């Protein structure tokens, strides 16, 4: 899902020319680290911001990314990360509210696509309103995304058996 959103941020012309995007990522936990690794391996210019010194050092030493120790909701830190020139901004901290705040500040400071991870199901009915009011390109709820993917899988025994044996129904 992240990959599709990032892909849509690039124009077809940029993809043909091998254009690498400038991506600022707030949150160096499991998801943030995995994203930093994947995006840097794809040749993008990635900057990771986190408040945990050990995480920042690990990410900076392990991957071809710039890592900054700081608060992703600080305009000073966002400026240091180059959010003004960023194509994409992604917030994946452990706090939904911090993710939304970071995206709001990033949108005000630059002209990037902003993506926030929001896990709390109580926000699920307000996501469109939040996206519109803050100007966020996408809000991703991992649990809802997983449920949507699973719902597209064949669930009947007949379909599962046909898939197992390679027969078409």
Give each language-model segment a name.
Residues 159-169:
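Single conserved hydrophobic/aromatic residue that forms the stacking wall/gate
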Residues 32:
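N-terminal Rossmann-fold NAD(P) dinucleotide-binding loop
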Residues 22-25:
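Beta1/beta-strand and adjacent pyrophosphate-binding region of the FAD-binding site
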Residues 28-29:
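Glycine-rich Rossmann-fold phosphate-binding loop(s) that bind the pyrophosphate
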Residues 57-153:
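Phosphate-bearing ligand-interacting subdomains
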Residues 39:
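Aromatic pocket-lining residues of Rossmann-like dinucleotide-binding sites
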